[in-house]
UniProtKB/Swiss-Prot annotation:
It comes from the Eukaryota. Keywords: Cytoplasm, Endoplasmic reticulum, ER-Golgi transport, Golgi apparatus, GTP-binding, Hydrolase, Magnesium, Membrane, Metal-binding, Nucleotide-binding, Protein transport, Transport. Small GTPases activation is mediated by guanine exchange factors (GEF), while inactivation through hydrolysis of the bound GTP is stimulated by GTPase activating proteins (GAP). NCBIfam families: small_GTP. The lineage of its organism: Eukaryota, Amoebozoa, Evosea, Eumycetozoa, Dictyostelia. GO terms for cellular component: COPII vesicle coat; cytosol; endoplasmic reticulum exit site; endoplasmic reticulum membrane; Golgi cisterna membrane. A motif (STAR) lies at residues 2-4. The keyword Mitochondrion does not apply. This is Small COPII coat GTPase SAR1B. InterPro entries: P-loop_NTPase, Small_GTP-bd, Small_GTPase_ARF/SAR, Small_GTPase_SAR1.
Amino acid sequence: MFLVDWFYNMFLWLGFFKKEAKIVIIGLGNAGKTTLLHLLVTGSLKSHIPTLRPNAESFTYGNVNFKAYDLGGQQNLRFLWKQYVPDSKTIIVFMVDSSDYNSIIESKSEIHDILGDEHLSQSPLLILGSKCDAKGHHNRENLIDLLDIRRFELGLNNSNNVPFDLIMTSSITRYGITDMLNWLDKCTDIIKNN
């Protein structure tokens, strides 16, 4: 078995075939979900109107092909979130506008609903503190406290065996984007091995 894994990893490293992963990007309206996905797909920024229907795009990072679903954050569209997470191999990316206190408090409720849901809590969850370049944004430690997630073990390899973390990002300055992509890449390896 060791030899088979070694050859498989060698072929991956050489780029003969790529891993596949599915991510669902959710969060309240105006958190930057569509802007982030556009940046990941095209490498450029563009202004967007609120997302009214699911938007599917693909992008590649390293040797992983990601199929990403950007779902609207308006209250009347949130019922879709659960429908796009069919199994524990789907990575949930929850974006929180770190510069908007009211949005953070409302996001806290949605995040705790995910963490308390028997089905969704089995999927890896990456919270992105977006707009960390904006004046008055909350830093990572502050955001962890405001979202009341300190009691949960953060990290890729936590004792729950379900990757869960918070990374600060800015689509405008690209701060944290590489950290996010590296986390997603490593997460696909963990999912594959579970």
